[in-house]
Amino acid sequence: MNKNIALIYGDCSSPEIVTQAVRVLDKIAAKHGHTFSYTRAYMGGEAIDKFGDPLPAAELEKCKQSDSVLLGAIGGPKWEGMPGDRRPEKGLLRLRAGMGLYANNRPAKIWPQLADASPLKKSIVDQGIDFIVVRELIGGIYFGEHKTIEQNGEKVAIDTMPYSEHEIERIGRI
């Protein structure tokens, strides 16, 4: 198997983690006769520092041309004061939208061996918890309008969550 993996090292301590993940992938490749090639891509704070943009079009294209993306954590205190459209997290939203990654599955299960560590009541844990939450990632509140208005002499925050029929049907099929 030959695969090209886009590497986004991410921000703060994340590059150290991604570097070790690449070492693991290389060991897997050697053991199983695979070949992984890597393409460096920038996103988040490191892209802001290098290009002034959380995900330049050329970096998104590198990801689209790859077989997969290994992504480190995005954001950190250094970029917290930036305007909303220039924050590192906007790069992540654009990556998801650009690659059509609109959903993720969030499993919730309490294994018997870990039941005592659960913050939930024992009576609930003893009944068993095993379900999956499907989370929509690129519509609604992520790309809706966010604004503050004056109403009756006080500030009111408004966050719209627009979803098209297509987006709702698509997430419902997961």
Where are these regions (language model features)?
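Anion-binding alpha/beta catalytic cores of soluble intermediary-metabolism enzymes, centered on
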Residues: 1-12, 30, 35-37, 42-174
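Short N-terminal binding/cap micro-motifs at the start of the first secondary-structure element
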Residues: 13-18
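Short catalytic helix/loop segments, enriched in acidic residues and glycine
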Residues: 22-32
